[in-house]
Amino acid sequence: MEDYLQDCRAALQDSRPLHVVLGNEACDLDSMVSALALAFYLTKTSEAEDIFIPVLNIKRSELPLRGDNVFFLQEVKIPEPALIFRDEIDLLALHQAGQLTLILVDHHILPKSDAALEEAVAEVLDHRPIEQKYCPPCHVSVELVGSCATLVTERILQGAPETLDRQTAALLHGTIILDCVNMDTNIGKATPKDSKYVEELEALFPDLPKRKDIFDSLQKAKFDVSGLTTEQMLRKDQKTVYRQGTKVAISAIYMDLKAFLQRTDLFTDLSSFCHDHSYDALVAMTIFFNTQNEPVRQLAIFCPHEALRMTICGILERSTSPPLKLTPIPSTSPNLQAYHQGNTQVSRKKLLPVLQEALSAYLDSAKMASGQSEVAVGMSREQVDKDLDKASNSLISGLSQDEEDPPLPPTPMNSLVDECPLDQGLPKFSAEAVFEKCSQISLSQSARACTSNK
């Protein structure tokens, strides 16, 4: 595949029409591999000897955030410099010149920023329920399976199986296994078609890695943040709550909060992160398993604005729906409040409405202050609590995206983001969701063990 990718890069320099296979904006492993494998197959089988160029729909600088992608590319010996990223090709200019044909893989909806490219879309291959209102008017192939790589495998094996080499087979095989959580029937992500094509790949290439080995390796790489900067760790799995000009980032971090807080120059990095991205506050949710294989969750609220920080902390501490069961943890910075979260069943998805509530309470207080730039500076905790009472009995519904962000495209089911708003099919398993499922399994096993010992 390396020679093919070099040909793709050379084709970018030619003044000729291009066929581009574009993955989704999350660029998770499924999206990346599906784009690579499908473009490679289409190039090999093109009667007109056209070249189909796989484009990873992120900036090159963002690839390190996707540890499983980086690991797998190294594992199958595909050099990163050979890949083509979204910031290295001007799709709009190509389209305006009449030189672009676009194939969407692992998504079927273009974001508002790419709306002009819809006319260039010639085909869609996706594994989520179709949204007719937004889907491009072209050939659309959609089937509810656990991994889009399964549909790419099917296309290859039904069309021209002789074109499939071991390197591409390894990419598809590992991706399906990761997406389908090692084909675990208890989790229920894998469909019969996913299982069928994993078995067919293993039959064609018996030396492919054992399922458990490749799943464990990819899963470990996916959660590994050891080589990331603080900003990369915060951006790796992040959502944003936005309300009337106030923005709060919520980042999932897969390590012990104690270790995170001991990072060199952490508070400088947190301040820079909030300043550079115009966040008024940052909520870090740390998630990991302890030595007894029990799930542990912790919270850290970083905010230089005292009134906003007190409001967020007050709402979280007082929350009963859901109850977080927070225990304060000492902090070395006055701008950061840390907690141990006793209720490990409260995921980020469940926390988002509580944070929306906190923003509403803060903005209500700001209105009462009538024009003060910093609300209630010097206000006592008891006074803040009185204001919080007005909002503490109800949760504010709404999206957890910036108001400027388009609600589309839906994020992939296996990406690092929590949920796809259009997906009503197979269960969604993000990194956060996989952790939550594993937590439930771990707790269930512990309960059974206690029962059997009685």
UniProtKB/Swiss-Prot annotation:
Region (Disordered): 397-420
Location within or outside the cell: Cytoplasm; Nucleus; Cell junction, Focal adhesion
Any matching Pfam family: DHH
Modified residues (Phosphothreonine): 411
Keyword Endoplasmic reticulum (UniProt): no
Assigned EC number: 3.6.1.1
Catalytic activity, as annotated: diphosphate + H2O = 2 phosphate + H(+)
Residue numbers carrying Phosphoserine: 400, 415
GO biological process, one term: regulation of microtubule polymerization
Extent of motif DHH motif: 106-108
Sites of N-acetylmethionine modification: 1
SUPFAM superfamilies named in the record: DHH phosphoesterases
Similarity annotation: Belongs to the PPase class C family. Prune subfamily.
Complex formation: Homooligomer. Able to homodimerize via its C-terminal domain. Interacts with NME1. Interacts with GSK3; at focal adhesion complexes where paxillin and vinculin are colocalized. Interacts with alpha and beta tubulin.
Name used for this protein in its record: Exopolyphosphatase PRUNE1
